[in-house]
UniProtKB/Swiss-Prot annotation:
Domain ABC transporter: 11-332
InterPro entries on file: AAA+_ATPase (IPR003593), ABC_SmlMolc_Importer (IPR050093), ABC_transporter-like_ATP-bd (IPR003439), ABC_transporter-like_CS (IPR017871), Mo/tungstate-bd_C_term_dom (IPR008995), P-loop_NTPase (IPR027417), Transp-assoc_OB_typ2 (IPR013611)
Compartment(s) where it occurs, according to its Swiss-Prot or TrEMBL record: Cell membrane
EC number(s) from the headed UniProt entry: 7.6.2.11
Main subcellular location of this protein, as a coarse class: membrane
Topological category with respect to the lipid bilayer: Peripheral membrane protein
Protein name per the record: Spermidine/putrescine import ATP-binding protein PotA
Role this protein plays: Part of the ABC transporter complex PotABCD involved in spermidine/putrescine import. Responsible for energy coupling to the transport system.
Keywords of the record: ATP-binding, Cell membrane, Membrane, Nucleotide-binding, Translocase, Transport
Catalytic activity: ATP + H2O + polyamine-[polyamine-binding protein]Side 1 = ADP + phosphate + polyamineSide 2 + [polyamine-binding protein]Side 1
Top EC group: translocase
Record: residues binding ATP: 43-50
Organism, scientific name: Mesomycoplasma hyopneumoniae (strain J / ATCC 25934 / NCTC 10110) (Mycoplasma hyopneumoniae)
Amino acid sequence: MKNIEKSEIIISLVDVDKEFGDKKVLDQINLDIKRGDFVTLLGPSGSGKTTILRLIGGFEWTTRGEIKFNGIDIKDVPAHKRDTATIFQDYALFPHLSVRGNIEFGLKLKRIKKKAEEIPDVVWKKFEHLKKKWQDKQKRKIKELKILQAHLEKLLENPQLDIKKRKKLQDKLDDSDFRYSNWENYLTSKSESFKKKYLTRKITKQEINKEITDIIDLVGLTGNENRAISELSGGMKQRVALARSLVIEPEIVLLDEPLSALDTKIRQKMQVFLKKIQQKLGLTFIFVTHDQDEALQLSDKIAIIRNGKIAQYDEPKQIYDYPVNKWVANFIGDSNFFQAKYIKKNQVEILGLKLYTIHDEFIPGQKLDCLIRPEDIDIDLNSGYFKGKVIQNIYKGSYYSLDIKVENTIINVETNDFYDLETQVFLKWDDDAIHLMEMENAEI
């Protein structure tokens, strides 16, 4: 897949469903990933984030929908033909090979473009002749499939169809969609096979040695080339797995919770290292994790996955500051939630007090969820919006986490200052600290 014309959007998932038997694990997934971005799929266990990664990598097939690589649907393309490399949670290193042996493994299959002067004119003429035949066949097959799909879609519009008949027709339509994807890739696949045979050569031993030396230096493994995998720490194994993936020069690196087995300090170092490598090489990284802090620190964009759907897809700061709903807000960080009532433009009522808000998009009288992050609340001993007392004080290393009781409401506050239990305090915040969200099934 290396010779497809490049576009800004490198991967696009369009209306992707995935079913395992009668269970739907992904439901209408739509996701565009830009070339060179570090994108994290974040969600709780069982949300579907790893399934999305496996679909992109070709380890699972979609039930329906499209997975586009540079604009072409590749859902029927097997994993080994996709321009991706995958780093698994357990690294999947070969225990019988050394560090060098693991990295070298993929290189042995790599081929190098021949110089133009090394290719006879007759080869180019043959390629152009075959390319025309492939194009004609591709157009004919795609036209046939479009006619078939239109016919099946027309039949499915009949409301009188019983469940069994409808499922049979839907299965035929899904199958035709896979065949359509196959023929959409036909010209590219045939062209690449021809180029591999006639326009490339095997990589030489000297070239292999240079590439291994370069990648080992890049990932910081110099001096460890001949060590056995069993002798390495978790962090070093991770570097070997990364080197093995990068040395084959993929366009996309898929990472399935690769840091989850590491202890905290090594994990933090590897987070910095991964981001540095990704930025240096300009590759697209798609990273799966359930760790919110990890996602916020590493990502250019985060897709929050919940129950097989994308709850929100945006830049980390936008998701943290402007979550689309209460669930996302609670999942992505510590939160204080209040029931709020929108009074009028730029005015909201919280805990019986009317306050200024930067929000102006809601309807007067509308009931809303209100989010205020603990770190956005200030403590004052003399004045503020609400008066309360400290009922819990927990030292977190770089700050104190306080629970403040305001009438019947507990408000969590993060502060650098220590306050004794039972201390009377006032709480206040900046206008933009209030984030209002629509309530599910809210009444006006």
